[in-house]
């Protein structure tokens, strides 16, 4: 099947005229027509005929002997919070307050995709403004998990993860503030890669928590993530947090026998993680040991303060970043007798419940009298944790563990308890807090036949070694091969 090929293989077949790019486009659009109405993946979509025309232009360049980009002809999906200049596509963050908004410019990562001849075909559903772990916070209804449509796909990049898992795109870009690429990848049985902070430009990404946000890759394998990442990474003068230089390109293999992995004792707590998740985590850690790698257990000593500090900082940054949305230029606008009332009514109608909760809590922790007690203290904790983790990753090559405490949960299961939903991030926020690269890869199935993810994290700028290790594991195992039965019979 065409969709079984890697991204590099697909491009090679297109470049050698073995595969017509229009055939790949038609295959993807056929799957969108078949599954999207049920699963609710896309927020906006480039019409099929336009994508075919763009694919034909790539085919013509190849026929004429012209060079084409590294991603030539690949249909790629984009999360709904990454700016795209296309009259057919919105950048609405799955929020009513941005309903109908069309970006006048491309995000740098989208510009890079286009320069590499990728076909950006649509924007995908998400938790509103990237705030959530289940995709239930979208103003346009949730995306459904293709492994079990009664369960969540994860969040906030749930639509992007489902697009890749179902073949409604061959790859996707999402954003990861506390696990929003890795957790949905885990829940959908694919690979999700969050690079080092600044390795991919944030210019054009609608901000949630500016010191935590990072664009990431959703693909079937680590090899595909590396291929996509290398095509779009680089220095960006439009992003003040961009790395000062491009990372070296992905190449070669890695010997697992030379590596040292740390499995935190806190990650093996049966009160936090489910039995299936612990079993898969321990099994893969044992497998690494059998391959000759060194795997040691060690206590971190700070997990209890990680989630509170993360949410104080992210809520504070969100309350500042979302102050710019007022209902004046686009989206929901409520008429009123005064400007203040217009702002209040428009924001109240335009933002969903979870977004309003985070704005209010963020405003509170930044308010006079509470700033130092909450925001100031949270940043002190962050600095402490960052130093501890960087010291740990000087001793070990990788930190390993679960991605999420459990398997995909049922819709509505955690809606009445926001704290239970926030704890979905307990294993994933560490990478964002410390600016480290991290990756989620499939690690088996639960007793209910639901995907389980395994996470690896390395020191900043060590992205390609992280990808190599994940690719090496996937080359020797088959956890990444199963596809959702709903979409692959």
Enumerate the language-model features and the residues they cover:
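An N-terminal boundary/leader segment
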Residues: 1-54, 60, 290-292, 482-489
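Gly/Ser-rich, acidic/histidine-flanked active-site/gating loops
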Residues: 3, 73, 212-214, 237-319, ...
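Enzymes and membrane/adaptor proteins characterized by extended Gly/Ser/Thr/Asp/Glu-rich
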Residues: 70-109
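Glycine/threonine-rich flexible loop motifs
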Residues: 91-100, 272-275, 371, 409-419
